[in-house]
C-alpha cells in the first residue's frame, strides 16, 4: 500500500462515484434517482452536523456497526460468533426490540452518522429492524448477509428502500464457499446476486480472508465474476481464529503485505468496484478506528462495544443514548490508552487483549 493512501478520502470518493454512476444509470427510474439525490444532500448535512459537534469538542464517527440479531440460518465452519457464544439459535437473549433500533437509528441520523453497517447473526431474520432502517433514508445501511434469505418479498423491501445495500458473503469459488457455508450455498447466493443485478439494486460482496483463499479472491477471475454479477464494493475481512487448530488460516504478515500490494494495484486501475480491507486498512488511518474513533459496535442486546471482535461493554443502548455511549468510561479509557494509538501491522489491534479490556471495564 502506498504511504500516501488516504482511506477516508478513498471511501468518500468511492461512494460519491457509485452514487454518480447509479444516477447516470437510473435516469429512467425516478424512484432510484430521487433517493440518490436525497442521500447526496443528506450526506452533506450529516458532515455539517459532525463538524458542529467537533467545534464543541465532541467527535462523532460517521460509521456505526450494529449486530441486530444473534440468530443465523447457517452453521458456517470457523464462525467467530458461534465459537464465542455470540450466536444463539435458541434466541434466549434479551434482544433490543424493533422500537429500540428505531430510536437508535433516529439518534444516529440526528448526530450525523452517514453509514450504519447491519450485521448479525443473519440480519435478514429481523425484517422489522430492516424496516426501521429503511425509514432513515439519510443513512446508508450496508446489510452484511449470507445471501440465502433474499426472497422476492425481501428484495421488494430493498428495491423500495435503496438505502438498504446488501453485502453478500462469499468465500471464493464454489468449492471454497460451500466448504465453509454448506453445500449449495454458492449457487443460491450467486443466483440472488444475479436477481439483484437485474433489478438494478446496489449491492456488494464480503470475503472472509484466509491463507487458503487469498490467491483466489484477489485474482482477476474472481473479481471479474463479481463485477459481472453487478457487485459495486468488495470487503476483505481477516479471518479471526475461532476454533482450536484454525490459527494457520488467519492471514499473517506475508498475506497482509500481499493484500496491501494487490489492493494498491486495483485501486489505481479504472474499476467499477471499490475495495475495503478490514482491519488492514486501519494501519493507514493512524491506528485502530474502534471505540468511537471511526466507529463502534452495538451488539444484539444493546451493549456498546469497541468493535465486533472485542465483545466487552460497560454501557447499554437500551438505557442510554448514542451520545452518552460515545463517552462511556470504557471508550474514553480505551481512546486514551496506547491500545488504539499509532500504526499497527494490519492484524486486529484489540484481538487477544481481553484482560486489558476487562480491566478498563472494571471487571
Model-derived features: where do they sit?
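Radical SAM/AdoMet-radical enzyme domain recognition
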Residues: 98-118, 124-237
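Conserved alpha-helical substructure of the radical SAM core
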Residues: 2-156, 161
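A generic "binding-loop/recognition-motif" signal
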Residues: 72, 173, 310-313
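Radical SAM enzyme [4Fe-4S]-AdoMet core and its adjacent flexible, acidic
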Residues: 1-13, 178-291, 300-305, 311-317
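Accessory C-terminal segments flanking Radical SAM cores
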Residues: 271-363
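Short, flexible helix/strand-to-coil boundary loops that buttress conserved ligand/catalytic motifs
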Residues: 80-83, 154, 181, 308, ...
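A short, flexible beta-alpha/helix-coil linker loop
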Residues: 84-88, 173-175, 241-244
Amino acid at each position: 500500500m502506498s504511504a500516501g493512501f488516504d482511506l477516508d478520502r478513498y471511501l468518500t470518493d468511492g461512494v460519491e462515484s457509485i452514487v454518480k454512476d447509479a444516477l447516470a444509470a437510473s435516469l429512467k427510474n425516478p424512484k432510484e434517482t430521487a433517493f440518490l439525490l436525497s442521500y447526496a444532500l443528506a450526506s452533506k448535512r450529516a458532515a455539517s452536523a459532525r463538524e458542529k459537534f467537533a467545534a464543541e469538542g465532541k467527535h462523532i464517527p460517521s460509521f456505526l456497526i450494529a449486530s441486530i440479531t444473534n440468530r443465523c440460518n447457517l452453521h458456517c465452519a470457523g464462525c467467530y460468533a458461534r465459537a464465542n457464544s455470540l450466536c444463539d439459535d435458541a434466541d434466549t437473549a434479551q434482544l433490543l426490540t424493533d422500537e429500540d433500533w428505531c430510536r437508535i437509528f433516529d439518534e444516529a441520523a440526528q448526530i450525523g452518522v452517514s453509514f450504519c453497517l447491519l450485521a448479525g447473526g443473519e440480519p435478514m431474520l429481523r425484517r422489522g429492524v430492516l424496516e426501521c432502517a429503511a425509514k432513515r433514508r439519510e443513512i446508508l445501511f450496508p446489510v452484511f448477509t449470507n445471501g440465502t434469505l433474499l426472497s422476492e418479498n425481501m428484495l421488494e423491501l430493498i428495491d423500495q428502500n435503496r438505502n438498504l445495500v446488501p453485502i453478500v458473503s462469499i468465500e471464493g469459488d464454489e468449492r471454497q464457499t460451500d466448504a465453509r457455508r454448506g453445500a449449495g450455498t454458492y449457487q443460491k447466493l450467486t443466483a440472488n446476486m444475479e436477481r439483484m443485478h437485474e433489478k438494478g439494486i446496489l449491492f456488494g460482496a464480503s470475503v472472509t480472508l484466509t491463507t487458503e483463499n487469498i490467491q483466489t479472491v484477489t485474482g482477476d477471475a474472481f473479481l471479474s465474476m463479481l463485477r459481472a454479477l453487478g457487485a459495486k464494493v468488495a470487503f476483505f475481512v481477516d479471518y479471526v481464529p475461532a476454533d482450536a487448530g484454525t490459527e494457520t488460516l488467519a492471514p499473517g504478515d506475508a498475506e497482509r503485505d500481499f493484500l496491501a500490494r494487490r489492493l494498491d494495484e486495483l485501486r489505481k486501475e479504472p474499476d467499477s468496484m471499490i475495495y475495503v480491507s478490514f482491519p488492514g486498512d486501519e494501519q493507514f488511518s493512524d491506528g485502530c478506528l474502534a471505540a468511537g474513533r471511526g466507529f463502534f459496535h452495538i451488539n444484539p442486546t444493546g451493549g456498546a462495544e469497541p468493535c465486533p471482535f472485542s465483545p466487552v461493554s460497560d454501557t447499554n443502548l437500551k438505557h442510554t443514548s448514542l451520545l452518552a455511549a460515545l463517552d462511556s468510561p470504557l471508550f474514553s479509557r480505551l481512546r486514551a490508552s496506547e491500545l488504539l494509538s499509532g500504526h499497527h501491522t494490519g492484524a486486529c489491534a484489540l484481538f487477544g487483549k481481553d484482560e486489558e479490556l476487562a480491566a478498563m471495564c472494571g471487571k
